[in-house]
Amino acid sequence: LDDRFAKAYEYSDCWVQDSRLVVLNARDAQARGAKIMTRTKVTSARRDGDEWVITTEDTNTQDEQEFRAKMIVNAGGPWVMDVIQGVAGINSSENVRLVRGSHIVTKRLYDHDKCYFFQGEDGRIIFSIPYEQDYTLIGTTDADHASFDERPVCTDEERDYLLAFANNYFKQTLSSDDVIWTYSGVRPLYNDGASSATAATRDYVLRVNDEGGAPILNVFGGKITTYRRLAESALEKIGAYFPNLPEKWTAGVTLPGGDFDVAGVGDLRVRIKSKYPFLSEK
């Protein structure tokens, strides 16, 4: 950091590999009886009395299957409105605001393993995180994203914004030549009519539509940090239609591979190193 910054405060947080988290949740669900269908999309859903008739398509073979269900949970993320309107053919006054978050990756800018949060003149904050051993991850932005069909890409404007933001704090002056790669994602935030993408709520909103028969639960918003609480809230909504659901249980249950004492991570690392000596220290 620049020498003019002499004071800071420190707190602890968590990080997660998002794709691995999704896979582990799918494995856990499968072990508990769920059927996981990858590379499959829902092409239509229609009400038939107190049931849904759902048509799916295998994206590799184009084979179609038909299923019946008492209820649909629409956790489509950025595509939640496409499921509501395009797949289920339902009109909805609720909507999501698609907000793009872009990141830049540079070579490692400092030796320690701490993260930084920086505050800018516009009132926003960005982070700087040691990333994949050899790099530093800097982000993120808040930019309205036009459509879920449009691939999210870090724009030159977003890249320059993050560089200027970081240059207010680091000794080293970064330029576009220092950016090794960029990536972007889209947040499906509940559209609360906020004046800017930054001001849009990060809370999730759950809405059940049962007009005309079988219910559908639509999930607007949500994030990794609170995904299990969101799921519990969703089950409370579902419980109005299925009163014999079990009590909440996920708070004290690990995902596959996590069933060991946190205090024993060091010993686990030693055992793995001994069993698989070809693995890199990293």
Spans of features found by a protein language model:
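C-terminal catalytic lobe of FAD-dependent flavoproteins
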Residues: 18-21, 28, 87-138, 143-282
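Core beta-strand elements of the Rossmann-like FAD/NAD(P) dinucleotide-binding domain
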Residues: 60-71, 75
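Short acidic, glycine-rich loop/turn motifs
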Residues: 56-62, 108, 120
